[in-house]
Amino acid sequence: MSDHKRAVLAGGCFWGMQDLIRKQPGVVSTRVGYTGGQNDHPTYRNHPGHAEAIEIVYDPAQTDYRALLEFFFQIHDPTTKNRQGNDVGTSYRSEIFYVDDEQRRIALDTIADVDASGLWPGKVVTDVSPAPEFWEAEPEHQDYLERYPSGYTCHFPRPGWKLPKRAEV
């Protein structure tokens, strides 16, 4: 575990995010939960101000933070404030919770690339914030779409989606 790194991302309902991100090369483990809100020990029914988020443990020898962020921006709409699909509210906001200054720098650079690319019709509204405590969600929410493959999701990879760096745009 000592060679692994951690990322925390929020981009709508955590079920769909986890289902897609856990399958990415280099991802060692994922868990869904709540972060960025007002109360300790939040629950699905009581998480004021918290975002539904995913904590990702990854192997930097197999993938990097930038690659995770590029996939994150491909599978959710970062241009809708507090909404993904039918899910509306601050729980479903787009937010990157960075664990160190390097992640913050990479997040801001990636957002600038997404904005410059024109791949999305609007400007990115994804917030970038220091990672507060991550509270693991209840067991029934972990790996939800693995247990219920026909369950609800509003996340999907967009075919042919490739994020160019600003210099390439």
UniProtKB/Swiss-Prot annotation:
GO terms of biological process kind: protein modification process
Claim: Oxidoreductase is one of the keywords in the record: yes
Pfam families: PMSR (PF01625)
Enzyme class: oxidoreductase
Protein task: Has an important function as a repair enzyme for proteins that have been inactivated by oxidation. Catalyzes the reversible oxidation-reduction of methionine sulfoxide in proteins to methionine.
NCBIfam families noted in UniProt: msrA
Protein's name in the database: Peptide methionine sulfoxide reductase MsrA
Species assigned in the record: Mycolicibacterium vanbaalenii (strain DSM 7251 / JCM 13017 / BCRC 16820 / KCTC 9966 / NRRL B-24157 / PYR-1) (Mycobacterium vanbaalenii)
